[in-house]
Amino acid sequence: MESRPGSFQYVPVQLQGGAPWGFTLKGGLEHCEPLTVSKIEDGGKAALSQKMRTGDELVNINGTPLYGSRQEALILIKGSFRILKLIVRRRNTPVSRPHSWHVAKLLEGCPDVATTMHFPSEAFSLSWHSGCNTSDVSVQWCPLSRHCSTEKSSSIGSMESLEQPGQPTYEGHLLPIDQNMYPSQRDSAYSSFSASSNASDCALSLKPEEPPSTDCVMPGPGPIKVTDDQANVSENSGSSHSTSEDHVTSTSHASSYSDEGHHSGPAKMARGPPEPPVRSDSLPASRAQLLNGEQHRASEPVDSLPQKEKPGLETVLPPRSSNQFCCLSGQDQVTDEDHQNCELSKPSESSQDDCEHLLIEDSSKALDSPKAHDKGSNKEFGLLKEASADLANTLNFGAIPHLRGTMEHRHSAPEQLLASHLQQVHLDSRGSKGMELPIGQDGHQWTVSPLHNNPKGKKSPSLPTGGTQDQTRKERKTTPLDDKLMASVHQSQSDVLLGEVDGHPNRAGRASSDLTSQQPSATCSSVQQTRDFLSAHKIVDHTEASEEGDNEPKECGRLGGRRSGGPRGRSIQNRRRSERFATNLRNEIQRRKAQLQKSKGPLSQLCDTNEAVEETQEPPESPPLSASNASLLPSYKNVPSPGDKVFNKSMILRARSSECLSQASESSKARGGVEGRMSPGQRSGQSSLALNTWWKASDSSTLDTEKANAHHGVCRGHWRWSPEHNAQPQVALSTEAPSNPDDSKELKTSTPQAGEEAVLMPFADRRKFFEESSKSLSTSHLPGLTTHNNKPFIQRQKPIDQNFQSVSYRDLRCHPLDQSYHSADQSYHAADQSYHSLSPLQSETPTYPECFATKGRDNSLCCKPVHHGDCDYHRTCSHPCSAQGTVRHDPCICCSGEICPALLKRNLLPKCHNCRCHHHQCIRCTGCCHGPQHSAHEDSSMAPGNAWKSRKAAIQEFPVDKWKPITGNRKTSHSGREMAHSKAGFSLSTPFRPCIENPALDLSNYRAVSSLDILGDFKRASNKPEESSVYEDENSVASMPRPLRSRAFSESHISLEPQNTQAWGKHQRESFSKGSETQPDTLGARKKVFPPPRPPPPNWEKYRLFRAAQLQQQQQQQQQQQQQQRCEEEEEKEQEEEGEKEEDLPPQYFSSELTGSCAPNTEEQPQSLKMGHQEASRQGSQSLQEQEAFALHPSNFVPPVRGCTVPQPEKAQHPCYYGTHGLWRTTEQEATVTPKQEFQHFSPPKGASGIPTSYSAYYNISVAKAELLNKLKQQPEMAEAGLGEEGVDYELAQKKIQLIESISRKLSVLREAQRGLLDDINANAALGEEVEANLKAVCKSNEFEKYHLFIGDLDKVVNLLLSLSGRLARVENALNSIDSESNQEKLVLIEKKQQLTNQLADAKELKEHVDGREKLVFGMVSRYLPQDQLQDYQHFVKMKSALIIEQRELEEKIKLGEEQLKCLKESLHLGPSNF
């Protein structure tokens, strides 16, 4: 064991006796701290071992290496039964680092301070070192954290690139940025919800007390005075600069400060999960103080550097301007997922080989990391690889000794950034849009570099479909640009690296990587330009965000500024400077805005309030300039060369990325790429999005959408006022304008000037204006109008405008549920991708994907044209594919412009699935709009290039998981959701169902969505082939009322429907018997014309497991059932009739059931699900798999248990909801027709899942169910008379078959749970035998006999209690269901009940007595047994009774299921001949 000072000592610790172990852990990967022992309890096992000390870092538990996760450690510790074997790592002796007065001071009087003080121990054992050079004392100070070991880091998504070939990564030597591993790992693991977590790693955190991550801030050596309340920015920045080489850090730090001073605005906005707070006594804090002390002197000469050299440094560093790594400025926590993958850890400059290898590797990872990106874009990736290789050669980090010496880090994020930005720039130049990777040659879409593509880390950004056509053009331009690009990169690289030799290597690496993507320095070496550009970045952020009514960027800018400068003075200075610049720039931008707005109509003016004008057409070479960029352009006017264009492009790109307008850039690029070739008017469509953003209340998209939209051509087309005050886009036709600094001028010139001046109206006025205009438009169906509302969407008067940029703003304002269901963001993008790769025909019109892509963030605004006759108006369907939740309805075109009253009554969120985005085509007043609109939709959806198949107007087309609370595996269900969403939303090939002709009838479609509707959506998605015919069938049946179709179900509705509804259902079945034969499911729940008042929706979450369990067999069953149904038509009709008659049975028969199982049905049903899964809950993996199956195969989900009133109808209804009405109707009908019996007989015991001893409810239910089934068998005889009239009702048979199958599956689950329980029982018995043997060896024989008797009595008493409670429950149930006339039988039952009650009371006394004996026996046993064996004894006793109860409960459930199964099978086989 190496014992050099400062080296780590690995100490094995073995604790015995079982929990509690007597020590406390703190830190962990979750907190970005090492997992250390914070406390050892006196007298505890850890203290008794005398090997563990506070401050020890856990590295191994029971032979399992730890990788920093506290949760993992806790699981391993809890999993230790009696022996806990640990390996802890502690510093042998503290080492004061060279230049670390802080540590030296700590160590002065305390040689063993490392082991005695929590504070130093944390600092010393912290997995991430403070960035010292690995060559000097770094071995002691850079222990390789277990979390950072190479093989582990390779599992961190794109962090695989951490494994550098030449990088020594051995235990005890931590590479310079281990800290980054923590955020990186976290980001990779949590990318699903922390979209900007990487931004938080790369940008300054928002709170002063929350130091930025190591990578994001390169501490500046300037006079860094760290105040207590504000850790120096460098605290966390495990910058790879070596404190021993002061000169190395000086320049770069100053530059980093100056840089970040300007970028405090952007940096501030990194709004991902905030960095974990850094303890004041942690290594980052001490490191900051060290930097204060030591680097203060080093940086003194450089103090004025920000003022003197700032321009030069910024020229070198501008790329770092947080644009690449911080998607900021109000972007709502949406740094792209790849930001996370490109965690800004120090570049590994160990060698050129490393750099090249990592560069290529990282570029590949960066490309591959987007979760939803098209994997087929290998050609793009190949180009990127080449570019990466070239760049690697260019950026030979290894060639610069300082860079190599100061930091060796396996986390090649800068290379990732290089690769991704190279990809950005390369592909930008190639895509000539400068903002987004063109769609791959194979037609797949690539968004901006992975750094800028996935908002929320999930949406796979996709270009508009038009991108495919543009690809070739972009490709043509690729070569010259790439050459120039590489040349400029090389030049800028050399500039950066030379400038940074004495500077912060990390900075240099970043700068180089950034420059590669930006390529500004090469062509625009002027310091001022870069400086302006940097400032502009921040200003862009400030301006865009602030002008959209969000002052957050400002505050964040201040915070960022405060944090970005190490010393408070410099921070304030930088902040003031940047704020002044921001103010000036903002003023200039506003002036430009005012000028542009004066020349535009009020509508465009409204659109422009979000942002200054963007160029109407952008040449392929340059991305659309944001307003702020436009204001910056004058500084670049003197840069005419193509390289300069590239510079501008990259600058703008970065500016956009700094605002995290990855989406915005995507959309603008998409617009640039696609719209450049599309009619400019289409671009104008995007501006409408800007309008919509105002109403977009959902937090996650407010700023994002505003900015994204603002960036999309707010000015892409001008709007003029038509006599009806409907702003219509005046399409500017100059599509290819040269990309030069004069773009902003082109903006003005290219956009037609509207004659009317408009004054910037306040938000309320704009909103009012939009609402009014939308109303007026909705009421006036002028054939010439292409825009529905003032939406500046490119609405060309095409009979079929696939560019459905719609305009209703209603949804944008309130997405009450959006926030609950944002998680499904990738769904939309999944859907997007499938459409981007559609045929080039769609490139003409910005299709829905473009709507998303161009809108970056505004996925919630899926716009689709609703064609009402000639009026090709576009409406934004706000719950678009994003499945963001309920949204407001479009104003009804047929009503007074307001939402249809019917919809309002039901609080319906009309959702149309027709055009790519669900439009509300059918949602107009169902009576007024039909025919033409439908046909237009059909035409549009069936257009040759239009791969989006029309879809029946149905309620929210959410994946089920979005609506239903998800208890299960969200990730696994995501794929299912995406699949279902893309399928359900867009791939249906069936003709769109004609608009509702009968308003009264189809209003049910638009009731508030219930889970069944959602589930049905899933079902529909996968059962498209079957349902296509159903859709057509629906057209004929459209007039049929569908009573509960879309309503949330309550048990009462299902079980207690009036008989007249049954008669109505029969009538309907007869009317459509032919259709039902071919598609039995089409005939179902049209029994009620007007649904009963809407009950509170049941909690579907409880039914997920049960439904999931029944998934796989459902499809097969359905097919079989359809065949069987035809064969059993008559039988089932009879049974149905019998069911109806049964409803007439005396209420006493059902009284117990109705009161016990029907009313609390909601509660019971969950339990019915639990019957199958309650015990299986222990088999978590199984249930999760079932859930996955459910998510992946929602279509297979058929209501298995009609008995589960709520879930069952839901299940049955789903298919019908989407067209196979029969199934759902059948469910409802059956639920009502085969009255409560069936549904009750299957409703699970109320108390079954509850306290095991409360069996009365359980037995009550089970007996009732059995009786109901028995009676159900007899019902056919009673109902025989009325059966002849009715046709065969095979629906009931189908339901019974489903019930049989579901019960069978449930039984299999229960039996599996029983087997697992038996294993537990056996294990506990073995433990009991061991305890018994130990006791026998140590205690007296009479005492041992007491123990033995106690254990036996405990078993007997528990079984007795269970048996008596069960019998008593059965008797009570019999009493409840007995006929009032059977007095004799009733008396017998009452007497028996009294007897059982007395016996149960005696048994309870016995149990109390046994409990008393247990205490005595425990006192006796505790005298003989050591602590660990005593714990074994306690565990054995406690588990013995619990396992007995659980076993009995499982047995009862299995017995009940078998009874139900038997009864169902018998009733199913009873035919008319048997009566």
UniProtKB/Swiss-Prot annotation:
Residues 1380-1470 form a coiled coil. Residues 151-175, 202-321, 432-523, 542-577, 610-644, 658-688, 727-753, 772-791, 1022-1041, 1055-1185 are annotated as: Disordered. Transmembrane segments: none annotated. Residues 1090-1099 have a biased composition (Pro residues). GO terms for biological process: actin filament organization; brain development; cognition; regulation of postsynaptic membrane neurotransmitter receptor levels. Residues 624-635, 658-667, 1110-1125 have a biased composition (Low complexity). Residues 1190-1469 form the ASD2 domain. This is Protein Shroom4. The lineage of its organism: Eukaryota, Metazoa, Chordata, Craniata, Vertebrata. The gene is Shroom4.
